[in-house]
Amino acid sequence: MELTKIATQNDINRQWIVLDAKDKVFGRLITEIATLLRGKHKPCFTPHIDCGDFVVIINATEVKFTGMKLKDKEYFTHSGYFGSTKSKTLQEMLEKTPEKLYHLAVRGMLPKNKLGRAMLKKLKVYRGSEHPHSAQVAKSSK
């Protein structure tokens, strides 16, 4: 009788995946990114092991949003001091810090523990089409 094989950290073979965000719907792109980071697209997926791939997002500012989200959706921050609540619209976040916008959206779809934080570190977001990971991407595609 053979037992089910459970993947260990040594069995994981990570790839570098480049996704172009140009003209893609933001929410659907984020779910795809979360699936790749978690490793659920692999047959060797194990919930307690970080078996996801590295994901590089290019053209992060050219993503599409449905509805009136660019004007209506707000992100709030609070430092802990009285009266320090600050808000930014989605349009402001996309112009100033698209990297933070992607990290916040993906973080909500990953586990809320050490494993989720390790998965989030494998996400690389860039505004334009240039990225410094071309050596890793070329090596993993072979």
From Swiss-Prot:
GO terms for molecular function: mRNA binding; structural constituent of ribosome. The keyword NAD does not apply. The keyword Thylakoid does not apply. GO terms for cellular component: cytosolic large ribosomal subunit. GO terms for biological process: negative regulation of translation; translation. Gene3D superfamilies: Ribosomal protein L13. InterPro entries: Ribosomal_uL13, Ribosomal_uL13_bac-type, Ribosomal_uL13_CS, Ribosomal_uL13_sf. Keywords: Ribonucleoprotein, Ribosomal protein. Part of the 50S ribosomal subunit. This protein is one of the early assembly proteins of the 50S ribosomal subunit, although it is not seen to bind rRNA by itself. It is important during the early stages of 50S assembly. Belongs to the universal ribosomal protein uL13 family. This is Large ribosomal subunit protein uL13.
